[in-house]
Amino acid sequence: GLINNTAVLNSTASTNSNGVTVTVFAGETATLPAETMSPGALANYTTTVSCDAGTLTGTNGQSAGNTLAITAAATATSPITCTYTNTPKTATLQLAKAWGANSSASDSASIGATTGGTNNTTLFSTAGGTAANSGAAVAITVGNTITFPAETGTNIGNYNTVLSCLAGGGATANTLSGTNGQVSNTLVIGAGDSGKAIVCTYTN
């Protein structure tokens, strides 16, 4: 432990904050606390802890028990600064359009831009029976609430439109608010979606 310990430090995203400096001595070992978050969800972030001097045993800032050995050489750095860096977890999003058998080529479907993402897909349209997608996948952030627009187009009322989403080929962390693609629906991007390609398909 330390003869002198730092106080609790609170910080609001996205504001960098510094605690009050305390005096430490060569030969001491500091136990670094696990970061907590309230309000908010710590699971939506990766937290990396780093120190500019001394010997650090671990870098996961969400884990308890990381220690910093204050070596004689480390005392040449004053103050020794340990930084917790939070990086939002991300995924990607692409929309797709599929048609069932007996779809008419004279019909069409238009799917507007999503909203609520760090980045959003753009409007695209396609003729009946022709598969399409929104183009290159866009990067979104865990915690985003994505709003999917209602599908529109020629003779859309003649079809049932089902909206479904997959993350990396499996289930998304959270469920869609609804599956009727002819009305607006939402999906909250969860921590379990981190690093995955999310594809949401409107099927007529």
Residue ranges, per PLM feature:
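Tryptophan-paired
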Residues: 1-33, 112-148, 152-153
